[in-house]
Structure formats: C-alpha cells, structure tokens
Amino acid sequence: MKTFSLKLLVFTLVLSFINCVAFAAADKPNIVIIWGDDIGQTNVSAYSMGVMGYRTPNIDRVAKEGMIFTDYYAEQSCTAGRSAFITGQNVFRTGLSKVGLPGADLGMRKEDPTIAELLKPLGYATGQFGKNHLGDKDEMLPTNHGFDEFYGNLYHLNAEEEPEHPDYPQNPEFRKKFGPRGVIHSWALPDGKQKIEDTGPLTRKRMQTVDDDV
C-alpha cells in the first residue's frame, strides 16, 4: 500500500499532464472514484484497520492495488467536496459551497473546468453515477461538462422524498417551480447537446432498490 503526501500528488499530476501525449498512445488504466456520503475516515478499514468492528474488503482492495491518500482539503459540505474534486478549484472561485434548492441558479458554470473534460482528449469514456449536488438545471448536469453519461439524483439525501410529507404544499404551481426533479439519466450527444430522461422521484420505496438501477 502506497501513502502519498499532497505535495507528491501535485508533483505527480504535473508530470502526468506534461507527458499526456505519451500516455495517449499507451494503454490507459481505468479510473474509479468512489465518494462516500456522511462517512468518516475510520468507516473504511483501509484507514482504520477495522477498529469500527467491521471491514470494507472491496474498498480495501482498491487501496492496496492502487493508491491511498491521507490529505484532502475542502469544506464539510457535499457540494464543496464534489466541486473541489471535479473542477480542481476552491469554493471561493466556484461559489459551490452549499447545496442549492431546486431551481436555484447555484451550480456548475460553463467556464468551470472538470476532470472529465481533461480526460476526454486522452481517449477516456466518462460517467458519473449517484448523487451529483452541483446544480439541478440542464446546463449544470455532468453530461454538459465533459461526462458521457450520468445517472443519479441532484440533491441532498432525502430531498426527493419531501413531497411525500403530509404537510408538503399541494399547489401544482408550487410543485412545478420549487419541487425537486426525479432521478436523472442523461447522455452527452455528438452535437454538444444532451439527451435527458427523468426516471421518476427517489421515493422512500425506491430508495430500497435504486442501487440496482445502475
């Protein structure tokens, strides 16, 4: 298992981009990034050696065969962490520090770079699956920012079940303007546009099986 400091990581990334032409001609490794929501470092036994009383063998295998990082700096927010990783920018530049409400203008902008856009010239096919948290308008979806495919929800953990609450406003105009979108399946098209399907709300019942969708 290899442990890398932040400085070594930055140096490695710089060397990688300098030699991108050489890499483009060679076989490329698969890149799998797993974001865990609301977990601590000790919840993954690759870091904690199982002190929580259980093991995470599949994730531990990824760590053993690849790299394990010990330092990462971001705000304690899903949106801030995802935006920092995907764009390589801090929240003072992107403004993506907190989760936006349905229909909010807060989200990915046209000028924001993404890791997917950097990988495309190297021949990678890219996808994002699960929670996104970087804006719910069409222009903010991952498939408008370098990803070939996206399947997931756009809000915090239980936002899409809120309309099930008995005190949720029933006014159709309110729901149309402020209600959450469902689970989105989208694709980037060759002409620069997107194909977008709303597969329906992420209800409490659907949460039991949604992992089987992908």
Sequence positions of predicted segments:
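Formylglycine-dependent sulfatase
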Residues: K2-K7, F17-V214
